[in-house]
Amino acid sequence: MMFPAVAAPPRRLPGERLQRSQNPVETSWLSFRILATRGPCVTSTFLFLTVAFLGLSWVSVAVAAHAEHPEDSATNFLFSFAENSLANREPPEDSAARPSSRSGGAERRRLDSLIPGFLKRRRIFKQLRPVDEFQLREFQEASSKVKAQFFSAGHSKVTFVDRPSAALLSFLHLEEEDVPYGVVIKAIPYDAFDFYESVAEPYIHRMFDDPRKFPYVVPVLAALRSTSKRVLYLVLPLYRELPETVDEEARSLDFVLLLAEMAMAVCQLHERNLAHRDLKEDNFLVSPEGHIVVSDLATLDITDNKSFLIGTSGYMPPETRSSYLLRKGYKRSRYGEKTDVYSLGVAFRHLAFMLEGLGVQVPHRTQLAKLIKKMTSPDPEKRPLIGEVMEDPFFASVDFRLVRQRAGKHPFKKLPGADLLAERQRARLEAREKADAAAKAADNAEVPAAKSPAGKTGGAGTLSGDRDRAGSGEKPAERAEEEKGRGRGAQTHEGNHDRTDDAGREELREGPGDQKPSGEENREGGQPPGQREEQREGTGLEEGFNKEDAQES
């Protein structure tokens, strides 16, 4: 029986069936079919984004994980900062009295940022000494003030500790006489995508770790990392706040010297091509000796570098907030020395108003008003540099050479016990220098110091020859075979020793600015101690950065 031919019904596409279907299960299935059949690119893109997100999440968690730290973490942390010390670059002696009025960035170093690259930041982070907040109540209180979430972190907070506990002093390896006025714990939170950028402030503080070279920067006692939270801690000595101290000692302070020390603090930063970018009277502190120090170095950066909106409202110059994009932080602005000069001029004006509000006459008020007007000029080209500010007639009675060395008077009164504290600090610095010198001597003692051929030095030459053969990959059997022939072995040994000695001398003489030794040679390249110290202090942050960049590449 033959069936009549019937035309096949037209095939419906998944999209048409989806439009007519009302069943949610069928709708979902048809949607998946459409995605699988008609959208292979969409499917692959979706899978790629999913895998990328999971991989990025894994990397961020691994980066933020706190690894265990070796016992000598505090020592390694100090050495890691000593390698790259941009701040250790001393200014020329002829500029000790008044700095030159060079243009901003005229002596710029070839750096994109003040802090190092990712690999070195990670190494510094791992070398931070870990601290458990639950064992020390001061850190527990400090950590409770900040919030560190996975995707975002809040602002840093400070905690004042007038009387540190015995457990805290023991943990910091301090005595009560070392911090007679108390300490400040600054908690710095960070998120999982921080990539170790939170080490910037501890890194910068360690650059200014020697108070004898940088007396106008607040010292740091310890830099720590939490074992249970995404928080870093800076432990600083408790100093007096500038506005409160001016309020208390308004009738006895030396106002001109106060402004001169504030200018000198900024000058020491600008001499090293650094800009603070958030100068205000609240970021200046008064030391126990009655002198000024600058604090809050988290905003420090290379001069003339571009950055998004940073600073305090009312202290920022017009060029950093002249447009909507700048004010909202959508566009970067250039921050340089004249940016700090504007902020410093606003701080001068606030302090002068504060003094007049307390019924105290401002000395040389007319000259100060002219100076502040120039410092706060809306046009950066008309704004003076910090060297020109210090040369203003308002500071005609100030010897900035003494101000730089802090050899003269102090604008505020000394606190009781300030002289004893200064003596203890000097003793601690000398002890640390001796320990560093002993460690360096121990390291140099491991380097072969042979200066003559093996036939004249005996045992020393033999040790050097063995090291040469070991470094060249020679096996013990080959050494035994070589020693069978005395004459030929002695000649080979002597030749190897001479080549090694020459290579060692060339390696010790490497580096810019090295000179040939004069006089008696020593273990550190045959240079007198004074010359070695100059070369060590002259090693800037640029050299360390170049090494780090080479490692990263």
UniProtKB/Swiss-Prot annotation:
Give the region (Disordered) as residue ranges: 1-20, 88-107, 432-553
Which reaction is catalysed here?
L-seryl-[protein] + ATP = O-phospho-L-seryl-[protein] + ADP + H(+); L-threonyl-[protein] + ATP = O-phospho-L-threonyl-[protein] + ADP + H(+)
Which keywords annotate this record? ATP-binding, Kinase, Magnesium, Metal-binding, Nucleotide-binding, Secreted, Signal, Transferase
Site description Cleavage, residues in chain: L111, D112
Tell me which residues this entry annotates as catalytic: D278
Q: Localized where? A: Cytoplasmic granule; Secreted; Parasitophorous vacuole lumen
The protein's matches in InterPro entries, at most eight in alphabetical order, are given as: Kinase-like_dom_sf, NEK_Ser/Thr_kinase, Prot_kinase_dom, Ser/Thr_kinase_AS
- For this UniProt entry, what's an example GO CC term? extracellular region
> What does the record say about the knockout?
In BALB/c mice infected with knockout tachyzoites (type I strain RH), virulence is not affected.
Q: Name one GO molecular function term.
A: protein serine/threonine kinase activity
Locate the compositionally biased regions of type Low complexity: 438-451
Going by the entry's taxonomy, the superkingdom of the source organism is recorded as: Eukaryota
- An example Pfam family from this entry, by short name, is Pkinase
Q: Kindly list the cofactors needed.
A: Mg(2+)
Domain Protein kinase positions: 125-395
What EC class does the entry list? transferase
Give the comment on domains. Answer: The protein kinase domain has an atypical kinase fold which lacks the glycine-rich loop that is critical for ATP binding in canonical protein kinase domains.
Name the UniProt record assigns to this protein? Serine/threonine-protein kinase WNG2
> According to the entry, what is the taxonomic lineage of the organism?
Eukaryota, Sar, Alveolata, Apicomplexa, Conoidasida
